[in-house]
Amino acid sequence: MERKKRLLKRTASVRIEPYLAEYIQNKLEIEPETGGVKIPYTTDLYHVVWNCMAKPDSHHDVMQDCNLKIYLPSRRSKMDGHPGKDPAYFNYLSSNAAKKIEEHIRLLFNFEFHRLMIENEELGRPLRNQDVVDNFIRRYSLRSISPDALLKNFYRYRQRLFPKTPRKYQKKRGI
């Protein structure tokens, strides 16, 4: 019984963009007993979540309508003077922490999506951009973002990477 209570305390819920929540839930492993997303310790997201973990105050706000449940990392240090954070006690993620986590997940999402699109262009476009977007949406079961929004996102990114400069026309003078 004590183990189950402790496991339930090891999760925290946050509210982020729906498509990012779908992406991270389908990309990472779900912990079967708690239903939280289990983040591998080798990722930057693990350390972002660990740094944002705090003890709940007596007047902390309980987030309603959360769409992402995170299985909190347990990183106990064995060195003197560097205590770890026990997730049973440090199980609160503030709204600012949720924003940081959302920013990092958006960074992961955009990196993977843009990498796929640019890879397709570098290979001579064996697939249409629309097909690459559809494959990406199908792979991560994204229902809350449209393919057009992803294409527009990529076109904006490509424009920032490779800005088009208008051609300078010079009027030819008669010979």
Predicted regions and their residues:
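Positively charged, polyanion-binding regions of nucleic-acid-associated proteins
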Residues: E102-R125
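Short, basic interhelical loop/turn and adjoining N-cap
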Residues: N135-L151
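Residues in the recognition helix of alpha-helical DNA-binding motifs
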Residues: N153, Y157
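Surface-exposed beta-loop interaction hotspot
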Residues: S94-A98, E102
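Long, low-complexity interaction regions most often at the N-terminus
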Residues: M1-L93
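Short Lys/Arg-enriched helix C-cap and helix-to-coil transition segments
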Residues: L161-I175
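Short, charged amphipathic recognition helices of the HTH superfamily
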Residues: E119-R139
